[in-house]
Amino acid sequence: MKKQLLAALIGGSLLAPMAASAADYVIDREGAHASITFKVSHLGYSYVVGRFNDFSGDFSYDAKNPTAAKVNVKVNTLSVDSNHAERDKHIRSGDFLNTAKFAEATFVSTSVEDKGNGDMVITGNFTLNGVTKPLAIQAHAVGEGQDPWGGYRAGFIGTTTFAMKDYGIKMDLGPASANVELDLVVEGVRK
């Protein structure tokens, strides 16, 4: 009896860390359950809004230990879409994203701060236009659970703002238009 109890305790202690580890997810871009949208003030009177149509990524997440989360995202900057072909051509030019030279933007998390109630700050290295700088994303875990197709999903929203000049974007649109606001909607399917 003592041997069985000892074996159960040892076995349980070895399995416990695995049960508490983060699950790995792939961002569900194919099912259109994720989006990366942006807005920039237009002369201080309105906003130009747009999105990136082609991106991919993955993340690890455990609701019991959000600080262990990891996020990796790649964005095809050629896929920028502001609903205006001529403007998109200009955004892809050397004045803005310089997609001929830098066709990809990336975000790789370096830390996650748990703020409670599903809120967190995800800090990482954001590379855009060939420049890499730290960027903090205010994020919220929306929910997670089984889907109707037998998979398991986790969803998040996030926002961040950055100055265009910090990423070597040459075009000066004036002080009212100096920053880009990103809105992120992410739904991942557990691998």
UniProtKB/Swiss-Prot annotation:
Concerning Pfam families, the annotation shows:
YceI
Keywords on record: Periplasm, Signal
Location(s) in or outside the cell: Periplasm
Q: Which residues form the signal peptide?
A: 1-22
What are the record's GO terms for cellular component?
A: periplasmic space
| InterPro entries, A to Z | Lipid/polyisoprenoid-bd_YceI, TTHA0802/YceI-like_sf, UPF0312/YceI
Q: Which family does it belong to?
A: Belongs to the UPF0312 family. Type 1 subfamily.
Instruction: Indicate what this protein is called per its UniProt record.
Output: UPF0312 protein Shewmr4_1178
